[in-house]
């Protein structure tokens, strides 16, 4: 049996009684607060997101077109984007400079394509708008969506590191 004894000030009895009651109330509130239980992620529920009406209609049209006609239009699945290749420094240029390529291709595919066109043994350094080197596994479509200029993706290439 433990007891806590609080001393009160001699000057003002009301202030002392308030302080002693305020000191004892936090301990009561700590005892009354329940301890949160941890719930593992395996018990969580995954809610399905409903598609907006416009996207739902496009999806249903796409599935109907593939079952009825046997194929889907090239415009919906095989999105081609324009890429302009610009040489940096003494790297030889290719003709023509503008090519169409599928949006699902990766940067490493572009690198192999340029090496084949230039008959270059090794790896070229590719830059998006002369500012940064994209990752080799990055898709061209995502880069095009972020960095297109006049409906073209400008990719500069060099056989040495051009920008530190």
Swiss-Prot record:
InterPro entries: Atg12 (IPR007242), Ubiquitin-like_domsf (IPR029071)
GO cellular component, one term: Atg12-Atg5-Atg16 complex
Topology versus the membrane: Peripheral membrane protein
Cross-link (Glycyl lysine isopeptide (Gly-Lys) (interchain with K-148 in ATG5)): 164
Keywords: Autophagy, Isopeptide bond, Membrane, Protein transport, Transport, Ubl conjugation pathway
Gene name of the encoded protein: ATG12
CDD domains: Ubl_ATG12
Entries under Pfam families matching the protein: APG12
Purpose: Ubiquitin-like protein involved in cytoplasm to vacuole transport (Cvt), autophagy vesicles formation, mitophagy, and nucleophagy. Conjugation with ATG5 through a ubiquitin-like conjugating system involving also ATG7 as an E1-like activating enzyme and ATG10 as an E2-like conjugating enzyme, is essential for its function. The ATG12-ATG5 conjugate functions as an E3-like enzyme which is required for lipidation of ATG8 and ATG8 association to the vesicle membranes.
GO terms of biological process kind: autophagosome assembly; autophagosome maturation; autophagy of mitochondrion; cytoplasm to vacuole targeting by the Cvt pathway; glycophagy; piecemeal microautophagy of the nucleus
Localization, UniProt: Preautophagosomal structure membrane
Gene3D superfamilies on file: Phosphatidylinositol 3-kinase Catalytic Subunit, Chain A, domain 1
Biased composition (Low complexity): 16-29
GO molecular function, one term: protein tag activity
Alphabetical list of PANTHER family matching this protein: AUTOPHAGY PROTEIN 12 (PTHR13385), UBIQUITIN-LIKE PROTEIN ATG12 (PTHR13385:SF0)
Assembly notes: Forms a conjugate with ATG5.
Positions of the UniProt region annotated as Disordered: 1-36
Cystine residue pairs: none
Protein name as annotated: Ubiquitin-like protein ATG12
Annotated family: Belongs to the ATG12 family.
Main subcellular localisation: membrane
